């Protein structure tokens, strides 16, 4: 950024087309958050109407996780081959079909399939929309682009909680899904006329189509084996999250099988840069493991241990969700000021100061608890708004949408595991202590993984010939690309 532009407010560096593109993508993220909270809120009504068991009802939430990894891969590859815009439109169409099908669903099977479709749309939304917005904004604003965009998820969660209390008592649970289709239509209209991302256009101008992750896995020499492994992974995830398996050893074995399959896909598609991809999946996995126990079980904690009534629970959840939304935006500013990794680490360290007081204060003073949750979620959950920027920087433009979509949505399986871990620990401790200890300990794992730049470090250890020394999005150096103590002079920009 030149000296002459430093005095211009950041928002004036963006033109109308860039803001329109951002709005179209942000609405998609709002719908993601809206749907996540929506299915949890109406679960008891759906269970009662369809006569479902508790396991069947819970599987409707898990269904989205079962299909997300494949949606991230498929729609991400579409974005790499045909452009980010087409993948964004396809994602929102999948979302629309799934949402409408939920509203019209006559029974469990139809709704389960609809949730699978929604999961694919959600995954494509994350990979394509995040990549599109980040690549469309100027390099010095790309942490803001990422953070502002992800704030839509938290806003959607807050909106869903408020709409639920107004709509369901009068019109029933199906009306919520029909209401959810309105912003989808608006987002689709916005996306129809947005320009293609600048980075993608520059990369593909006058060049032959790239070989995408889908081409490598499903059209290459190992395509038959990979197709079989895809079905095996889907079946294993179904049994893990919806199959009512009581044997922990079997569940662990199936989980390990899925991990082997996903790592195999990453090794095949990333070539010599597979260590980076595998470490990024671990980063996302632990990011979900530290944050989602609170996301999923906070309402239960407020109802059971603090004995709050539904109105008070809604108020506290508003503080939590709004804090996360604000934190995404704050994280964007911090990331552009301090750098992505340094901002991430500083924010998580600050959040650690608040996590114990949140669950130690009790329920006597609702407003103090709400404020503590606001700031803890702002610092601990909100900083995840720049996670797409962090992940995307490790991938070249030609592979970024699929790389981001696949690594994030495989790691997002931690969101399905996190509530289970919290509930298991709560069998020996009270729920508040379980949530605090789980979040506190696992946050340090993420701090180490990001702070030490382990994706670059492990790449340097295992396959140094394919090491990327600079962020592909903003050209800033990767600290893990050189040995400790080598100094800034050791950074020599390399192509990958």
From Swiss-Prot:
The alphabetical list of record keywords is: Cell inner membrane, Cell membrane, Membrane, Sugar transport, Transmembrane, Transmembrane helix, Transport
Transmembrane portions of the chain: 22-42, 58-78, 86-106, 116-136, 148-168, 170-190, 224-244, 247-267, 278-298, 313-333, 353-373, 378-398, 406-426, 431-451
Name the Pfam families on file: MFS_1
Would the keyword Ribonucleoprotein turn up in this protein's UniProt record? no
Q: State the coiled-coil residue ranges.
A: none
Query: Is this entry keyworded Transmembrane helix?
Result: yes
List the molecular function annotations (GO) for this entry: carboxylic acid transmembrane transporter activity; sialic acid:proton symporter activity
* The organism's place on the tree of life at top rank: Bacteria
Cellular location(s) = Cell inner membrane
Question: What cellular component GO annotations does this protein have?
Answer: plasma membrane
Bilayer topology reads: Multi-pass membrane protein
Catalytic reaction(s) noted: N-acetylneuraminate(in) + H(+)(in) = N-acetylneuraminate(out) + H(+)(out)
Q: Which SUPFAM superfamilies match?
A: MFS general substrate transporter
Question: Which PANTHER family does the record match to this protein?
Answer: CARBOXYLIC ACID TRANSPORTER PROTEIN HOMOLOG (PTHR23508), SIALIC ACID TRANSPORTER NANT (PTHR23508:SF3)
By sequence similarity, the record places it as follows: Belongs to the major facilitator superfamily. Sialate:H(+) symporter (SHS) (TC 2.A.1.12) family.
Q: What does this protein do?
A: Catalyzes the proton-dependent transport of sialic acid.
- Official protein name in the record: Sialic acid transporter NanT
Gene (name only): nanT
């Amino acid at each position: 950024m030149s000296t002459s532009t430093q005095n211009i407010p950041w928002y004036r560096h963006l033109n109308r087309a860039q803001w329109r593109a951002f709005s179209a993508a942000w609405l998609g993220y709002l719908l993601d958050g809206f749907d996540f909270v929506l299915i949890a809120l109406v679960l008891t009504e759906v269970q009662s109407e369809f006569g479902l068991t508790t396991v069947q009802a819970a599987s409707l939430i898990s269904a989205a996780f079962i299909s997300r990894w494949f949606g991230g891969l498929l729609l991400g590859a579409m974005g790499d081959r045909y452009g980010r815009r087409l993948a964004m439109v396809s994602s929102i169409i999948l979302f629309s079909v799934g949402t409408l099908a939920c509203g019209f669903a006559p029974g469990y099977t139809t709704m389960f399939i609809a949730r699978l479709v929604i999961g694919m749309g959600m995954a494509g939304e994350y990979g394509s929309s995040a990549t599109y917005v980040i690549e469309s904004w100027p390099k010095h604003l790309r942490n803001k682009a990422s953070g502002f965009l992800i704030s839509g998820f938290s806003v959607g969660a807050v909106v869903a909680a408020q709409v639920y209390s107004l709509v369901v008592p009068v019109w029933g649970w199906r009306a919520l899904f029909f209401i959810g289709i309105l912003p989808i239509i608006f987002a689709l209209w916005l996306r129809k006329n947005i320009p293609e991302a600048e980075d993608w256009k520059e990369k593909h101008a006058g060049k032959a189509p790239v070989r995408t992750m889908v081409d490598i896995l499903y059209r290459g020499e190992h395509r038959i084996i990979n197709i079989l492994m895809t079905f095996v992974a889907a079946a294993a995830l179904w049994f893990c999250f919806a199959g009512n398996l009581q044997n922990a050893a079997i569940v662990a074995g199936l989980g390990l099988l899925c991990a082997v399959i996903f790592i195999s896909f990453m090794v095949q598609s990333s070539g010599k840069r597979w260590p980076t991809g595998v470490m990024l999946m671990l980063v996302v996995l632990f990011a979900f493991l530290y944050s989602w126990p609170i996301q999923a079980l906070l309402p239960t904690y407020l109802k059971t241990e603090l004995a709050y009534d539904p109105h008070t629970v809604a108020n506290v959840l508003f503080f939590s969700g709004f804090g996360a939304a604000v934190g995404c935006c704050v994280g964007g500013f911090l990331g552009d000021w301090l750098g992505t990794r340094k901002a991430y680490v500083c924010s998580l360290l600050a959040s650690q100061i608040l996590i114990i007081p949140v669950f130690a204060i009790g329920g006597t003073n609702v407003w103090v608890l709400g404020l503590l949750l606001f700031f803890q979620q702002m610092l601990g959950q909100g900083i995840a708004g720049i996670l797409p920027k962090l992940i995307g920087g490790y991938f070249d433009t030609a592979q970024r949408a699929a790389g981001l979509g696949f690594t994030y949505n495989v790691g997002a399986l931690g969101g399905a595991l996190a509530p289970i871990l919290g509930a298991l620990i709560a069998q020996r401790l009270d729920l508040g202590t379980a949530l605090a200890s789980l979040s506190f300990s696992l946050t340090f794992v993420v701090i180490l993984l990001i702070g030490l730049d382990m994706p670059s470090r492990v790449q340097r250890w295992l396959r140094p010939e394919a090491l990327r020394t600079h962020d592909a999005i903003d050209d800033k150096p990767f600290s893990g690309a050189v040995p400790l103590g080598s100094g800034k002079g050791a950074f020599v920009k390399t192509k990958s």
